[in-house]
From Swiss-Prot:
Monomer. Interacts with GPS1/COPS1. It catalyses: 1D-myo-inositol 3,4,5,6-tetrakisphosphate + ATP = 1D-myo-inositol 1,3,4,5,6-pentakisphosphate + ADP + H(+); 1D-myo-inositol 1,3,4-trisphosphate + ATP = 1D-myo-inositol 1,3,4,5-tetrakisphosphate + ADP + H(+); 1D-myo-inositol 1,3,4-trisphosphate + ATP = 1D-myo-inositol 1,3,4,6-tetrakisphosphate + ADP + H(+); 1D-myo-inositol 3,4,6-trisphosphate + ATP = 1D-myo-inositol 1,3,4,6-tetrakisphosphate + ADP + H(+). It comes from Homo sapiens. The modification N6-acetyllysine is found at K340, K383, K410. This is Inositol-tetrakisphosphate 1-kinase. Mg(2+) 2 binds at D295, N297. Changing K18A: Loss of kinase activity. Changing R106A: Loss of kinase activity. Binds 2 magnesium ions per subunit. Pfam families: Ins134_P3_kin (PF05770), Ins134_P3_kin_N (PF17927). Changing D281A: Loss of kinase activity.
Length: 414
């Protein structure tokens, strides 16, 4: 790996807080020891002057959100960043901006999980029913909740999945509690899970599962309890001690998540969006033992992932090797877009713990049609088959193309 990486240039843009939290300077030093040059990008200057760049690592979530609020400075920064990417298709970007926009929107990311559920066939995974509330609760709110499969209690979250406010949530137990909900927000069925959350930190083909405290069990159905407002970040800290996480007793099923399920879930998300650095929050339904994805995060904190820098360096090597192989075979720069979107070339270097791609997974899927099909109802509206989320051998390019077209592109236009 040292010989291959020598002379490569990696640019990064992270907030100062993120740099300190990750101790990212240690990663820069690790890269330099491999003969790579690491450049901290200044987006207030033309990126062209700071290149050439083989790889860009970024967390532009704050900037993207501010740009979406029409902040002129942030709009200029995002435009400058996108302009450089468009002019340099050979540069690997971790991760694509349209995908980040999708993950910043809980409604869109939950819809993506639901689409993956419709594509895969496995009873080990369930997608909690959800819906978006765009206006204050009125007479038809309960009807809409029932139509979308929501029952009390349910959890209410901000639509935006980033920033301090994104951790502010509420558990609603009855119709009266709906009056305190401030739209726009996303409501999601609460699933009892014996107060254990599994945070899956993904770096390309590698992932690490970290166990965290979570909300205790609550009785199913409507009750006269007052709504509970809480900060999920505080509840699920490693050292968290809260009355909300104190479990009276373990009820029903209590087991760890399946490695096979996590592998297939992370692979599906990587190939649907072209992302490499993300987190998946998973709970285990204590009645069925099924895995439920309750959140997806872009470039999380990786707390508890001791090999994060090694995994990241290995992933960069994997992607660059795949790009080099594609170029040698075709000589076509346009295909670099495809290699970056997949970001899972066969035979690459992977992290020490778990590889979530089988040998040749991407090459073997080229040219296949996705088994996932959309049904149409009488009115011509596409309707998803009612299937559990599962673990097929791989996700085909046509499924990837479908998800990117219907979600990421839509997100980038907003």
């Amino acid at each position: 790996m040292q010989t291959f990486l020598k002379g490569k240039r990696v640019g990064y843009w992270l907030s100062e807080k993120k740099i300190k939290k990750l101790n990212f300077q240690a990663f820069a030093e690790l890269c330099r020891k491999r003969g790579m040059e690491v450049v901290q990008l200044n987006l207030s200057r033309p990126i062209e002057e700071q290149g050439p760049l083989d790889v860009i690592i970024h967390k532009l979530t704050d900037v993207i959100l501010e740009a979406d609020q029409n902040d002129s400075q942030s709009l200029e920064l995002v435009h400058r960043f996108q302009e450089y990417i468009d002019a340099h298709p050979e540069t690997i970007v971790l991760d694509p901006l349209p995908a980040i926009r999708t993950l910043l929107d809980r409604s869109k990311s939950y819809e993506l999980i639901r689409k993956i559920e419709a594509y895969m066939e496995d009873d080990r995974i369930c997608s909690p029913p959800f819906m978006e509330l765009t206006s204050l609760c009125g007479d038809d709110t309960m009807r809409l909740l029932e139509k979308n499969g929501l029952t009390f209690p349910f959890i209410c979250k901000t639509r935006v999945a980033h920033g301090t406010n994104s951790h502010e949530m509420a558990i609603v137990f009855n119709q009266e509690g709906l009056n305190a909900i401030q739209p726009p927000c996303v409501v999601q069925n609460f699933i009892n899970h014996n107060a254990v959350l599994y945070k899956v930190f993904v770096v390309g083909e590698s992932y690490t599962v970290v166990q965290r405290p979570s909300l205790k069990n609550f009785s199913a159905g409507t009750s006269d309890r007052e709504s509970i407002f809480f900060n999920s970040h505080n509840v699920s800290k490693p050292e968290s001690s809260s009355v909300l996480t104190e479990l009276d007793k373990i009820e029903g099923v209590f087991e760890r998540p399946s490695d096979e399920v996590i592998r297939e879930l992370s692979r599906a998300l990587r190939q649907a969006l072209g992302v490499s650095l993300f987190g998946i929050d998973i709970i285990i339904n204590n009645q069925t033992g099924q895995h439920a994805v309750i959140d997806i995060n872009a470039f999380p904190g990786y707390e508890g992932v001791s090999e994060f820098f090694t995994d990241l360096l290995n992933h960069i090597a994997t992607v660059l090797q795949g790009q080099s192989t594609a170029m040698a075979a075709t000589g076509d720069v346009a295909l670099l877009r495809h290699s970056k979107l997949l970001a899972e070339p066969a035979g690459g270097l992977v992290g020490e713990r778990t590889c979530s791609a089988s040998p040749g997974c991407c090459g073997s899927m080229m040219g296949q049609d996705a088994p996932w099909k959309a049904e149409a109802d009488a009115g011509g509206t596409a309707k998803l088959p009612h299937q559990r989320l599962g673990c097929n051998a791989g996700v085909s390019p046509s499924f990837q193309q479908h998800c990117v077209a219907s979600l990421a592109t839509k997100a980038s236009s907003q």
